[in-house]
């Protein structure tokens, strides 16, 4: 779909890298990796610079922890005039109640809660799209 993908790793030297199966898919898609120690990715200069370079108004966000890094990044993106879409089944926390609180706070601050299928069909727009058959077979049964 030719969407820019940025993924951040929170202090990988201490916490470890992104899990191997996901990391390999991100590498295969030529995603931009940014290591950070800040909880909000927006407090990382490399992240801010890259966001300026790609110049996108709408941001789809996934990750962990919903109530820490995802929350702080979402709020900062919203405060910087971005439209943020949080993918419900792609965010989480160690405790369910923390994830729920994080999601609720993101929504109260102006983020939109969406799911993976919503993203897919909104981006594809038409069953004739070249990506529809290839990608829809992975989750539409």
List PLM regions with ranges:
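Alpha-helical substrate-recognition element adjacent to the catalytic core
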Residues: 7
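A short, N-terminal amphipathic alpha-helix
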Residues: 1-4
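Active-site anion-handling motifs in enzyme catalytic cores
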Residues: 10
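Active-site-adjacent betaalpha module
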Residues: 13-141
């Amino acid at each position: 779909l030719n969407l820019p993908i940025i993924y951040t790793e929170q202090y990988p030297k201490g916490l470890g890298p992104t899990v191997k199966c996901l990391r390999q898919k991100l590498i295969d898609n030529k995603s931009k990796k940014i290591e950070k120690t800040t909880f909000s990715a927006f407090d990382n200069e490399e992240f801010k610079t890259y966001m300026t370079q790609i110049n996108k108004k709408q941001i789809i966000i996934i990750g962990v922890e919903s109530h820490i890094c995802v929350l702080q990044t979402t709020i900062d993106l919203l405060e910087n005039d971005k439209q943020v879409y949080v993918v419900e089944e792609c965010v989480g926390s160690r405790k369910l109640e923390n994830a729920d609180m994080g999601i609720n706070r993101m929504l109260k601050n102006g983020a939109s809660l969406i799911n993976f299928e919503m993203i897919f069909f909104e981006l594809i727009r038409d069953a004739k799209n070249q990506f529809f058959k290839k990608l829809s077979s992975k989750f539409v049964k």
